[in-house]
């Protein structure tokens, strides 16, 4: 299981939101490249970038910050989400050197877009499913649907999606611990590898996920915990490697 540091971008800065609320923002750095360098030095094998402005506006906004990170670390796999709503945007990111495209809202509202992307960019497409009590939310979490996250994930198995980033909205940015039960339940019911996200706050959460990783949990995205110091990133990755 790999530990993936999250770098959330808002107006060119590295920030964290609480429960996806743009008005509840904490700024951690003015330099995404320096932040990425910090995690690379500690052994990061992939970074998770989110264009928060893009997620809310439906188009890429922090493109320059994203491309700076990719250029600075050409050997570092990068996954990007937020505002990827058409093939033109997806193609631009792939050409810029992005390794994985995370499709959130469009995966829910237009699943055929995911199918098209998988055909165009095999093994480079990740679906981001954000759920509240097992029901999917979209549009930067502002729109709640009545779609069951497990049922929706099964739809993507036939497309060749490389993984699913599963975020429990109620836990995200709240440092309350990851929803292991819901994450494992999803992993058991789909053949697509799961990347856990939302609420991971300490080594206990990492251990809890690692114990269940054999069900298909391939990674864990960590945000606020590594910025506020409740989780040591290097220690977490070394622990996963040793077990």
UniProtKB/Swiss-Prot annotation:
GO BP, sorted A to Z = L-histidine biosynthetic process; L-tryptophan biosynthetic process
- What superkingdom heads the lineage? Bacteria
* Protein name, as recorded: 1-(5-phosphoribosyl)-5-[(5-phosphoribosylamino)methylideneamino] imidazole-4-carboxamide isomerase
Active site feature: 8 (proton acceptor), 130 (proton donor)
Which CDD domains does the protein's record reference? HisA
Q: Where in the cell is it found?
A: Cytoplasm
- What InterPro entries does its record include? Aldolase_TIM (IPR013785), His_biosynth (IPR006062), HisA_bact_arch (IPR006063), Isoase_HisA-like (IPR044524), Isoase_HisA-like_bact (IPR023016), RibuloseP-bd_barrel (IPR011060)
**What UniProt keywords apply to this chain's record, in alphabetical order?**
Amino-acid biosynthesis, Cytoplasm, Histidine biosynthesis, Isomerase
* Keyword Isomerase recorded: yes
- Report the catalytic activity: 1-(5-phospho-beta-D-ribosyl)-5-[(5-phospho-beta-D-ribosylamino)methylideneamino]imidazole-4-carboxamide = 5-[(5-phospho-1-deoxy-D-ribulos-1-ylimino)methylamino]-1-(5-phospho-beta-D-ribosyl)imidazole-4-carboxamide
- Encoding gene, per UniProt annotation: hisA
Q: Which GO terms describe its molecular function?
A: 1-(5-phosphoribosyl)-5-[(5-phosphoribosylamino)methylideneamino]imidazole-4-carboxamide isomerase activity
Q: What is its EC number?
A: 5.3.1.16
**What's in the GO CC field?**
cytoplasm
Pathway where it operates: Amino-acid biosynthesis; L-histidine biosynthesis; L-histidine from 5-phospho-alpha-D-ribose 1-diphosphate: step 4/9
Q: Which family does it belong to?
A: Belongs to the HisA/HisF family.
């Amino acid at each position: 299981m790999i530990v993936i540091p999250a770098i959330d971008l808002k107006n060119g800065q590295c920030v964290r939101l609480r429960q996806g609320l743009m008005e509840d923002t904490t700024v951690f750095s003015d330099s995404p490249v320096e932040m990425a360098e910090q995690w690379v030095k500690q052994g990061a094998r992939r970074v998770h970038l989110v264009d928060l402005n893009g997620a809310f506006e439906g188009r890429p906004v922090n493109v320059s910050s994203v491309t700076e990170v990719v250029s600075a670390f050409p050997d570092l796999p990068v996954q990007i989400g937020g505002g990827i709503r058409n093939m033109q945007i997806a193609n631009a990111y792939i050409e810029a050197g992005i390794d994985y495209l995370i499709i959130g809202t469009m995966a829910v509202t237009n699943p055929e877009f995911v199918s098209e992307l998988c055909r165009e960019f095999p093994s480079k497409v990740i679906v981001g499913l954000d759920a509240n009590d097992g029901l999917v939310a979209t549009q930067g979490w502002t729109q709640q649907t009545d779609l069951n996250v497990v049922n929706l994930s099964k739809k993507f198995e036939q497309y060749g999606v490389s993984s699913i980033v599963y975020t429990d909205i109620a836990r995200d940015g709240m440092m309350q611990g990851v929803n292991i039960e819901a994450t494992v339940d999803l992993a058991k019911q789909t053949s697509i590898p799961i990347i856990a996200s939302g609420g991971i706050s300490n080594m206990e959460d990492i251990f809890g996920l690692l114990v269940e990783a054999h069900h298909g949990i391939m990674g864990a995205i960590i945000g606020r915990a590594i910025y506020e110091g409740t989780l040591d990133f290097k220690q977490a990755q070394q622990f996963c490697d040793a077990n």
